[in-house]
Amino acid sequence: MEQEKQAQIEQAVTTILEAVGEDTQRAGLIDTPKRVAKMYAEVFSGLTEPEFDDYKLFDSLNEGEMVLVKDIAFYSMCEHHLLPFYGKVHVAYLPEGGKVLGLSKLPRLVEHCAKRPTVQEDLTVTIARKLQENIPVKGIAVAIEAEHMCMTMRGVKTPQSSTKTFQFTGLFKEQEWKNQFLMEIR
């Protein structure tokens, strides 16, 4: 992160702490603005990194049978409250043209898309769209199950509640494929 931007974040954190009545000079808070700026550089790195473009394909005998990577752990920040939400992403696709994506690319794509302020619904759609646009597929299915700190810590205060979102494209819009995906991620 640029020094100027880091300084802006540090000043903003100091202002917030002062506004809520904290003594920003007490021992436990002196370096907090620096720590928060460093943390934001990490958790929002998807905003400053180049667009994810590592869609390495391999030849495969698989022609149209589901490839599923499930339980991809992730965290992101809710764009409404700047509080974390975290959970698991399940991504499946139906290969086309005898090509499959390198398996490590799916968790890397999820991480890249999640490292920015967003909402779970948009994150789900973004992952599906990026895959649909960049690899030859007959369909994509993405499911995310997450706990939102904006629901746990504030507002309705519902600890351990989970939110599930889904996005289906191509053949996964057909009930047979959709059902198979949903059964596999249970």
From Swiss-Prot:
It is an enzyme of class 3 (hydrolase). Zn(2+) binds at residues 78, 81, 150. It catalyses: GTP + H2O = 7,8-dihydroneopterin 3'-triphosphate + formate + H(+). Pathway: Cofactor biosynthesis; 7,8-dihydroneopterin triphosphate biosynthesis; 7,8-dihydroneopterin triphosphate from GTP: step 1/1. Keywords: GTP-binding, Hydrolase, Metal-binding, Nucleotide-binding, One-carbon metabolism, Zinc. Its EC number is 3.5.4.16. The keyword Protein transport does not apply. GO terms for biological process: one-carbon metabolic process; tetrahydrobiopterin biosynthetic process; tetrahydrofolate biosynthetic process. GO terms for molecular function: GTP binding; GTP cyclohydrolase I activity; zinc ion binding. Belongs to the GTP cyclohydrolase I family. This is GTP cyclohydrolase 1. It comes from Enterococcus faecalis (strain ATCC 700802 / V583). The lineage of its organism: Bacteria, Bacillati, Bacillota, Bacilli, Lactobacillales.
